[in-house]
Amino acid sequence: MAKKITAFIKLQVKAGQANPAPPVGPALGQRGLNIMEFCKAFNAATSKLEPGLPTPVIITAYSDRTFTFVTKSTPASVLLKKAAGVSSGSKRPNTDKVGKVTRKQLEEIAKVKEADLTAAELEAAVRTIAGSARSMGLTVEG
């Protein structure tokens, strides 16, 4: 018989830097999950990613206090800010432009995000990422 699921916990943790401090500790501790076991497993799973990039993770907690987790790709906004070399998006994206991204950069970001996007083709994924860039106040070139 399958284990009973008690909770889904969604967090954003920096790749390779999970530790028992907030937000990880309190979120797992209140469910009675082993915090250090998660930290070690998460850090091992994200060891190939660039350290420090925020990585969304969905933790499934079971009634016997075990867990499984799935990592997602880094949010598009973080990748776009990094590509454009800006620290934050524009407060008024329609009038104030804060940076530029090229078509090539959009394609690279779309390839990274490909598994998490619903787009059927790379071109559709690029258009989705370009829309995110425009809504952040970035100019899309190409």
Swiss-Prot record:
Single GO MF descriptor: structural constituent of ribosome
Cellular component, GO annotation: cytosolic large ribosomal subunit
Record CDD domains: Ribosomal_L11
Record InterPro entries: Ribosomal_uL11, Ribosomal_uL11_bac-typ, Ribosomal_uL11_C, Ribosomal_uL11_C_sf, Ribosomal_uL11_CS, Ribosomal_uL11_N, Ribosomal_uL11_N_sf
GO BP terms: translation
Modification note: One or more lysine residues are methylated.
Keywords from the UniProt entry: Methylation, Ribonucleoprotein, Ribosomal protein, RNA-binding, rRNA-binding
Pfam families in alphabetical order: Ribosomal_L11, Ribosomal_L11_N
UniProt xrefs under NCBIfam families: L11_bact (TIGR01632)
Family statement: Belongs to the universal ribosomal protein uL11 family.
Known role: Forms part of the ribosomal stalk which helps the ribosome interact with GTP-bound translation factors.
Subunit (UniProt): Part of the ribosomal stalk of the 50S ribosomal subunit. Interacts with L10 and the large rRNA to form the base of the stalk. L10 forms an elongated spine to which L12 dimers bind in a sequential fashion forming a multimeric L10(L12)X complex.
Protein name as it appears in the record: Large ribosomal subunit protein uL11
Organism: Xanthomonas axonopodis pv. citri (strain 306)
Gene name of the record: rplK
